[in-house]
Regions:
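C-terminal substrate-binding/catalytic lobe of Rossmann-fold NAD(P)-dependent oxidoreductases
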Residues: 6-8, 13-65, 145-267
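Rossmann-fold NAD(P)-binding glycine/threonine-rich loop
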Residues: 85, 90, 98-120, 136
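Rossmann-like NAD(P)H-binding beta-loop-alpha module
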Residues: 132-144, 160
Length: 267
């Protein structure tokens, strides 16, 4: 049975790569897509991919006039929440690849998913190495009480911290908050230089030319430290593989789940 999807952000870096990946599958089809830049054109014409014959629309609300099984969100954080809620209202399951959504946004989305009895899979980063980084960090946090998170990205990335860093901090908050030897209120000097306190973790965001996407977490004990790091290359292929898996699995549960590991067997 073919999974019909609506793809928001279809001509962006990740969305266009996913669209091309979908064109190579025989069990997923794009019935409508969103691209404000190329609205009213055919997706395949824009991407030079003849097999993609769906129309492009300005908004998710327009695109959702086409019935779909799964709505895939790859736009911007300022519109992602409303797009997801609209898709749930139309009875679609949702895969979220957009970073920058807050815990408050996710709380609202979780409620809507339960109300509509649909699955939502939110993945800050679809790469397998990120999934493993998160798992290894959760193990380390049980034994090492102090850590800090650093995310690196190109100079033009608007959201901070990255979805990967935000998701990592959220996951570790379920284990315990990172201890601070010197409480923030006792810092002498500019406290902002210690980073942001996000769900119990100190998080630092670096935005400079020369970076693509990297995430790092450093755990510290007396006379020893542990560093876990993920680095992305310029190809979107790791994200495509993860997103295809998410599309195929998001209808297997009800409610919000955060992280690709929720549909992987990592036991």
């Amino acid at each position: 049975m073919t999974i019909l999807i609506c793809l928001a952000g279809a001509t962006g870096w990740a969305g266009s790569a996913l669209a091309r990946g979908i064109a190579q599958t025989d069990d997923i089809a794009i019935v409508a897509a969103v691209s404000r830049t190329h609205a009213r054109r055919i997706l395949g014409d824009v991407l030079a991919e003849p097999g993609l014959t769906c129309p492009l629309y300005t908004s998710a609300q327009e695109a959702l006039a086409h019935p779909c099984d799964v709505f895939v969100e790859f736009t911007k954080p300022e519109v992602a929440r409303s797009n997801v809620l609209a898709a749930l209202g139309q009875g679609a399951h949702v895969v979220i690849g957009t970073s920058g959504l807050t815990d408050a946004d996710y709380a609202e989305i979780a409620t809507a998913a339960e109300d509509h009895q649909r699955g939502v899979l939110a993945v800050g980063n679809f790469a397998l190495t990120v999934v493993l980084l998160q798992k290894f960090a959760e193990i380390a946090a049980r034994y090492i009480p102090q850590w800090e998170i650093i995310d690196y990205a190109h100079a033009d990335k608007m959201d901070a911290p990255s979805g990967t860093a935000r998701e990592l901090a959220f996951r570790l908050s379920k284990i315990r908050p990172s201890e601070l030897s010197v409480p923030l209120e006792q810092i002498q000097g500019e406290v902002e230089t210690r980073g942001a306190r996000l769900t119990g973790s100190q998080v630092h965001s670096i935005r400079l030319p020369g970076y693509t996407i990297s995430a790092e977490i450093i755990f510290g004990l007396p006379d020893q430290k542990l560093t876990l790091r993920h680095d992305s290359g310029s190809s979107a292929q790791p994200y495509v593989d993860g997103a295809l898996l998410a599309i195929r699995k998001v209808n297997t549960f009800v409610g919000l789940r955060r992280g690709l590991d929720n549909v992987l067997d990592l036991t």
